[in-house]
A protein has these predicted regions:
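Short helix-to-loop capping/linker segments positioned immediately adjacent to catalytic or ligand/cofactor-binding
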Residues: 51-54, 70-75, 117-122
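Ligand-binding beta-strand-loop-alpha-helix segment within the catalytic cores
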Residues: 60-62
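N-terminal accessory regions of nucleic-acid-interacting proteins
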Residues: 71-85
């Protein structure tokens, strides 16, 4: 099972410099969006693709797990609120007519947030290598040092919008390469973050077994 049972799953978009230089200005604040807690699945559970979407991709993300209530926090307060870290897969479906890919129809489908089953504590996350591999082919290869906002700053940003409670998760974004990480039924996606661990899930069509 996932290492926590969040009531809120918040996530940052455009928080990696190698991605932002292609789509936005590097001085823009990262975007914050939500994923439904109902879309969490454990390692090795299938990612189920909807029949209506022809383009679905995976995104490796370092996930922060909250250990104490936090709201409108400073960076120092946010840092103290972090219980630990795990790995997450921010699965995304291309939206209708190519519209905003951070809406519920893209981000919150059933099974669209695999989360690791191990919570890591007491580690330095400043420069961790993170990769995505699909059927043995590497599609993402980045490092947490390239984030615009680090752990504490990410939690502080989200806390200015909404309260975070123990067990909640903040996904801190994904590096470049997501558009090369398209998945289809029969594929296997394996994500890995140095010092955190691996997260592997098979891909099936929704409605199949």
């Amino acid at each position: 099972a996932p290492c926590c049972q969040p009531r809120t799953v918040a996530a940052l978009a455009y928080n990696y410099k190698d991605l932002v230089v292609r789509v936005a200005r590097t001085d823009d604040e990262p975007l914050v969006f939500l994923k439904s807690p109902a879309c969490l699945v454990a390692p090795h559970e299938p990612i189920r693709l909807p029949a209506w979407s022809e383009r679905v991709w995976v995104e490796v993300a370092l996930a922060l797990v909250i250990g104490r209530p936090v709201f409108e926090a400073s960076s120092d307060e946010a840092a103290r609120a972090i219980l630990g870290w795990t790995i997450a897969n921010d699965v995304t479906a291309a939206n209708i007519c190519g519209r905003d890919h951070h809406l519920a129809r893209s981000k919150s489908l059933v099974s669209f947030c695999p989360v690791g089953d191990i919570l890591r504590r007491g580690i330095d996350t400043a420069a961790l290598r993170m990769t995505t591999t699909i059927n043995g082919s590497r599609t993402q290869d980045g490092c947490t040092r390239d984030r615009i906002l680090g752990d504490a700053e990410a939690v502080a940003l989200v806390s200015r919008i909404m309260p975070l409670l123990p067990g909640d998760i903040v996904l801190t974004g994904t590096p470049a390469g997501a558009m090369s990480s398209l998945i289809t039924p029969g594929d296997r996606a394996e994500l890995e973050i140095e010092s955190i661990g691996r997260l592997a899930n098979p891909i099936i069509r929704r409605g199949s077994r």
